């Protein structure tokens, strides 16, 4: 491959972030997916997933059965730009009847966002999916969701993460209040307090105001004092971001918020860009590392039929592992030992 072409591939690789979202059913995974699209500008109004007739359906829930039941059955691949990066987001099924699709998807990503219901913590399906992530040494970012509702104590949730899945939590944002009193988060990296204002039905981006901790302390209140006490404890035990252990799948940066009201969504999406790794070389069938600028190769992780109800079709979703894809090129199918035009 020529040097200019190799350089372009390297540049594009650095701009890519490919990740999946895993969760137990109804933890808010598909709603979070929709809100990522909202904050990226890919959609102008978000439609949260609810199991009721007459409500808007999320963009990633496209099958009739998904829209009827308000759940994700098949993995959806979404691509959108954000902060001069190309984001590939794989919205995976959480319901156990459809989890085989999820396992295949986790072989195609570079990182994972694990969504936990803050009132329930780690649930059975999340635990199963996390074990697949661990077997692949995938970096995991954690989002404690639904803080706009009555929730468990955040310190207790951190203890549960470490005890149940042996993943050391390193909180990045920390809640001020919960339920109806949830007003914002403290960003431990910047030492600022972000105050959120709800929008109608959460259909548009939440209004955000950044304050210094000194400015925020003027608001006072029991919730604020409790937050300061907890932050002091986190600082004392050294619960800060550790990039090497995160990239090795040994620790997890933790963010808090509410996908439904958009609280904390932007900070989580920023973290995907800032913390999640870009694509790296992968082993081929001979277990040899294939350089990113080597001739084209790809891993097909999903084949979907009849996506368009107007005609019969069959589409393969593939993760490009090396080189450049050009429409109409001829490739070798290593499983069938044949060639095909793509």
Where are these predicted regions, by residue range?
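Structural and coupling elements of P-loop NTPases
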Residues: 1-339
């Amino acid at each position: 491959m020529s040097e200019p072409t190799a350089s372009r591939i390297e540049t594009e690789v650095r701009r890519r972030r490919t990740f999946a979202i895993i969760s137990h059913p109804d933890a808010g995974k598909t709603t979070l997916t929709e809100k990522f699209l909202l904050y990226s500008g890919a959609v102008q109004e978000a439609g949260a997933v609810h199991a009721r007739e007459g409500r808007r359906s999320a963009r990633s829930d496209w099958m009739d059965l998904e829209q009827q039941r308000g759940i994700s059955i098949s993995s959806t691949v979404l691509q959108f730009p954000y902060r001069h990066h190309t984001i590939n987001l794989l919205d995976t099924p959480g319901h156990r009847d459809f989890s085989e699709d999820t396992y295949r998807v986790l072989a195609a990503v570079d990182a994972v966002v694990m969504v936990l219901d803050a009132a329930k913590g780690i649930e059975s399906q999340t635990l199963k999916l996390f074990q697949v992530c661990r077997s692949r040494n995938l970096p995991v970012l954690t989002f404690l969701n639904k803080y706009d509702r009555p929730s468990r104590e955040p310190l207790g949730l951190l203890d549960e993460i470490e005890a149940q899945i042996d993943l050391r939590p390193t909180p990045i944002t920390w809640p001020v209040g919960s339920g109806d009193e949830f007003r914002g988060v403290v960003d431990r990296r910047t030492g600022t307090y972000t105050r959120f204002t709800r929008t109608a039905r959460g259909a548009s981006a939440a209004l955000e105001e950044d304050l210094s901790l000194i400015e925020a302390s003027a608001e006072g209140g029991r919730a604020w004092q409790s937050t300061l006490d907890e932050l002091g404890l986190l600082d004392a035990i050294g619960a800060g971001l550790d990039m090497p252990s995160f990239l090795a799948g040994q620790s997890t940066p933790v963010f808090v918020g509410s996908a439904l009201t958009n609280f904390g969504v932007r900070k989580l999406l920023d973290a995907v860009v800032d913390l999640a790794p870009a694509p790296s070389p992968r082993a081929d069938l001979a277990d040899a590392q294939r350089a990113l600028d080597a001739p084209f190769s790809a891993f097909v992780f999903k084949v979907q039929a009849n996506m368009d109800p107007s005609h019969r079709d069959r589409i393969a979703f593939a993760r490009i592992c090396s080189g450049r894809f050009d429409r109409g090129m001829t490739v070798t199918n290593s499983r069938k030992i044949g060639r095909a035009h793509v």
